[in-house]
Amino acid sequence: MTLTASPTAARTPAEEKARFEGNKLAKRLARETTRAIADYNMIEAGDKVMVCLSGGKDSYALLDILLSLQKRAPFAFEIIAVNLDQKQPGFPPEILPDYLRALGVPFHIETQDTYSIVTRVIPEGKTMCSLCSRLRRGILYRVASELGATKIALGHHRDDILGTFFLNLFYGGKAKGMPPKLVSDDGRHTVIRPLVYVPESDLIAYAQFKQFPIIPCNLCGSQENLKRKEVGRMIQEWDRKHPGRSWNVFNALSRVVPSHLMDRDLFDFVGLKPTGVADAGGDTAFDQIDPEPDTAGPGCASDAPAGQADGMAEQRVVFR
């Protein structure tokens, strides 16, 4: 009788541990993505989801997770991966098609030489990202219409949401972030961000575990957005020195109290008058300025935002 060694027996303890941690991470990412999809009704029965694949870690992870969830979703929906080849110098045109064929997922490669347009318009050494992003967005909206996609899925994660919020706060004077779901300016497309609850550190680890064929994001040679980089460093520093702080700021984006801010469009301060009816949460005129304690730590993203816990079981989409 011939004995065959099992695959598990061939692994070293270090490899077995890495595999265990990777599988645990995959389950956590699937859980957080499912929660975001359910909380914001991102994907519905019959949807055709266009996953925008750039070749970076975030979009690879998004496609991988959605394909996994599609197999056990309680309803049917389609996925099509789309990459925009902008003719950046050195871009390897074969990597994504080969990867997607191996996955067996429907895909479309859209080739548009936006690189030449951007380099012609933007002076050398200046940041090209803003114009490039606008051109890319318009092309992807057109492709979504041509493909009959009902949802456009982007790979922005928790740190992107926080970074955009702080950029608008510090440099734009606005409390404005990056929503998990929006309708495009022309009113024709729904854009979703299923990784909204996922920190970037998890996506870095997941890319290493899955060995995605990452395509560098600096092929265009554009100057990196220094303000965004600075904000990113600030968030990373918080995570090191003050665990839980960045999660508390993130949670605050879904715990807005308009009556305790200053936006007259959100709350009628001008018409505010006594009603004779007690408001337990309304009188803070003589309170201390100390914030309410929040005992949630780095894992508080797994808790439903305040006010949404009741009845959540009835609304939640369950992927078995």
UniProtKB/Swiss-Prot annotation:
**Motif PP-loop motif residues?**
54-59
Q: Which reaction does it catalyse?
A: cytidine(32) in tRNA + S-sulfanyl-L-cysteinyl-[cysteine desulfurase] + AH2 + ATP = 2-thiocytidine(32) in tRNA + L-cysteinyl-[cysteine desulfurase] + A + AMP + diphosphate + H(+)
The cofactor(s) it depends on are: Mg(2+); [4Fe-4S] cluster
Name a GO molecular-function annotation: magnesium ion binding
Q: Where are the transmembrane segments?
A: none
Set out the biological process GO terms recorded for this chain's protein: tRNA thio-modification
State its Enzyme Commission number(s). 2.8.1.-
| Pfam families from the UniProt entry | ATP_bind_3 (PF01171)
What sections of the sequence does the record tag as coiled-coil?
none
What name is this protein filed under?
Answer: tRNA-cytidine(32) 2-sulfurtransferase
Encoding gene (name): ttcA
